[in-house]
Amino acid sequence: MKAVGLVVEYNPFHNGHLYHAQTAKLQTGCDTAVAVMSGHFLQRGEPAVVSKWARTKMALQSGVDLVIELPYLYAVQKADIFARGSVSILNELECEALFFGSENGDIKPFLETAQLIDEHKHILNDRIKEELKKGASYPAAAAIAFSSILHTESALDLSKPNNILGYQYVTSILTGGYPMKPYTTARISSDYHDADLPEGENHIASATSIRKAMIGQNLEACLRFLPAASARELAAYRKSFGLWHTPESYFSYLKYSLSTVTARELQQVYEVEEGLEHRIIRSIRKSSSYQEFMELLKTKRYTWTRLQRMNTHILTRTKKQDMQKLLDNDKAPYIRLLGMTKKGQAYLSEKKKALSVPLVSKLSSFSHPALDLDVKASRIYSLPIEEPLRTEFDLQEYGHAPIRYDEDEQHFLNV
């Protein structure tokens, strides 16, 4: 059996993701798709609109064979750390290929750019430091530095979110010396951050536009952009727990957290840098919504995404020293299995004896500081759910066995 790795969030799983999973197998010649998926909080610092279990069920019904959780340690991070953790898991599972979406669908510029940047990394680092001193945000500083050496027509456009992540995946493969071949395909139809559902006959929409419509209480308008399985799981989650999760859902908890912490304590939280703790405390006192808080907090130096990640770390009280200690390791400390098809189970049985890190199926069987972070993030995620459903949700984190799906008979075996 041969596997292709996918790094995903599935927030939610839509037709573009279905195309991605199908094309990954076709273009690479692999028969098994392994998805490393962010858990309850995502790379941009947002909560997933529905739980990782609901999103796993969507994926297993739509061509993905194994779903592995990307630990919080890597999931709520800037692109290079996010990619490093994801790729290390795919390598541990002996994926022969990594497949990702990009703007143009050509892998050559990614490989050339990675080599060029590696050759000029000292110049780049110096230029980034210069731009940061001028007050630029890190992404803006990096973009200026990259443009100073990437000045050919064939150079990779690193202003595009998918290209940035793709570049980091390729860099992680090369830096790690992993025997994994990167492939890419062009994104189809909808732009990554399109805020509105497209009109006409198009059946591909951005996850951003789908979430916006869902949160506006209009799931029906999203149906043509979703596989039937995703529509079912979204409706079932809403019926079971009574909400879609949004950043605004957590504002009262964030405000409480910031009302009970000192500036000195806040300064110890991961990604709270350079005196930002004072601005945070001043801004939260004046804010009556998450949107208002973010608008007061945002500056030229700190992007919305960076601040959202910081807010999530405040909610989870993740400290700099704890995170840094965990990040000192080059690879993920465990593999947390969320779900599998029959084919995925066969692939895992073939590979698990060679794993150099523990395979975690149930939390009761394993303990690790990084896993403690995952559990804490899950408990924070459940806060907007009303009791007694919240306690029921929290207990799932410990008692939920990996979801098993029979792709031949098209039904779940244990849910």
UniProtKB/Swiss-Prot annotation:
User: So which domain of life are we looking at?
Assistant: Bacteria
Q: EC number(s)? A: 6.3.4.-
> Which keywords belong to this entry?
ATP-binding, Cytoplasm, Ligase, Nucleotide-binding, RNA-binding, tRNA processing, tRNA-binding
Pfam families noted in UniProt: HIGH_NTase1
Tell me the outcome of changing residue 309 to A.
Answer: Almost loss of activity. Decreases tRNA binding
Q: What is the effect of changing residue 353 to A?
A: No change in activity
What's an example GO cellular component term for this entry? cytoplasm
Annotated SUPFAM superfamilies: Nucleotidylyl transferase
What InterPro entries does the database record attribute to this sequence? Rossmann-like_a/b/a_fold (IPR014729), tRNA(Met)_cyd_acetate_ligase (IPR008513)
Q: What class of enzyme is it?
A: ligase
The answer to whether keyword Ligase applies is: yes
Q: What is the effect of changing residue 188 to A?
A: No change in activity
Catalysis: reaction(s):
cytidine(34) in elongator tRNA(Met) + acetate + ATP = N(4)-acetylcytidine(34) in elongator tRNA(Met) + AMP + diphosphate
What are the BP-aspect GO terms? tRNA modification
Where is ATP bound in this sequence? Answer: 7-20, 101, 162, 187-188
Question: Under the GO molecular function aspect, what terms does this record hold?
Answer: ATP binding; ligase activity, forming carbon-nitrogen bonds; tRNA binding
The record's subcellular locations are: Cytoplasm
Nucleotide-binding among the record's keywords? yes
Q: What is the effect of changing residue 306 to A?
A: Almost loss of activity
Q: In the UniProt annotation, what is the result of changing residue 256 to E?
A: Cannot form a dimer and has no activity
Q: Tell me, how does this one assemble?
A: Homodimer.
- State the family it belongs to: Belongs to the TmcAL family.
Its biological purpose is as follows: Catalyzes the formation of N(4)-acetylcytidine (ac(4)C) at the wobble position of elongator tRNA(Met), using acetate and ATP as substrates. First activates an acetate ion to form acetyladenylate (Ac-AMP) and then transfers the acetyl group to tRNA to form ac(4)C34.
Q: What is the name of this protein?
A: tRNA(Met) cytidine acetate ligase
Q: What organism is listed for this UniProt entry? A: Bacillus subtilis (strain 168)
